[in-house]
Amino acid sequence: MITPKHLVKKIKGDYRLIVVSDIHGHLDRFKVLLKKVRYIPEDYLIILGDFVEKGDQVIGTIHFVEELAKRERVFVLMGNCEWALDALLTIPELANQIPEYLKRVSSNGCIREVYHRLHLDNGHETMLGIQKQIADYLHNEIAFISHLPVT
């Protein structure tokens, strides 16, 4: 469950600021973009949310963003897609929304990936059971996402 957090940072002196949003699980494209702008650790990098779902490298993108976030000058904010992912997997009352979510979201995304990887499409699980298994599988990823600031 998400608890809203806010980030305040005061910076003195000259600096270069790179702001990226809407990566949506396209890790390869994100890495190309960072090379194209010649990102270096001395730059300030803000990832303005929506780095999950839609693409076919969502779990890898989460891990990459989490590694970047360990740097002093990288700030990651939660977007609506991260909020939705967290809510869908941590609020039991939303478990029944998983089938609709799988229909609405593109053929990719980490929920779909784990759903198929764990063979949850066999019809033998309740929606609450499916939610729990996916949440357990993505425990570390959800922990990272749920602690991101929103501003």
Regions found by a protein language model. Give the residues of each.
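N-terminal active-site segment of His-dependent metallophosphoesterases
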Residues: M1-F64
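Active-site neighborhood of divalent metal-dependent phosphoester bond hydrolases
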Residues: G55, I59-I62, E67-T151
